């Protein structure tokens, strides 16, 4: 499932994004953020993080540096 989403993002980056002017307000761009989110967190959480990011990418948000959060360790420290 994760590979399907990554494939969709790569298709967008290669074929759709070059035909449009750069409009992303963030660094890394939303598509790069999505790739990293899926690679770090898997399909479910990667999808959630990517959707949240895309919804923030509009003219009324200041944008800026917004990295993908690190994956939290599921182990409880003893």
Curated annotation (Swiss-Prot):
Annotated localization: Cell membrane
InterPro entries assigned: Membr_insert_effic_factor_YidD
Keyword terms, alphabetized: Cell membrane, Membrane
Any one Pfam family match given in the protein's UniProt record, by short name: YidD
Function: Could be involved in insertion of integral membrane proteins into the membrane.
Record-stated family: Belongs to the UPF0161 family.
TM spans (from-to): none
PANTHER family: MEMBRANE PROTEIN INSERTION EFFICIENCY FACTOR-RELATED
Main location: membrane
Domain of life: Bacteria
Keyword field contains Membrane: yes
Protein name: Putative membrane protein insertion efficiency factor
């Amino acid at each position: 499932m994760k590979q399907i989403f990554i494939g969709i993002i790569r298709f967008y980056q290669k074929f759709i994004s070059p035909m449009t002017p750069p409009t992303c307000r963030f660094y890394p761009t939303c598509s790069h953020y999505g790739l990293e989110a899926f690679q770090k967190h898997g399909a479910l959480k990667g999808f959630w993080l990517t959707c949240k990011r895309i919804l923030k990418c509009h003219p009324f948000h200041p944008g800026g540096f917004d990295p993908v959060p690190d994956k939290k360790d599921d182990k409880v420290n003893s």
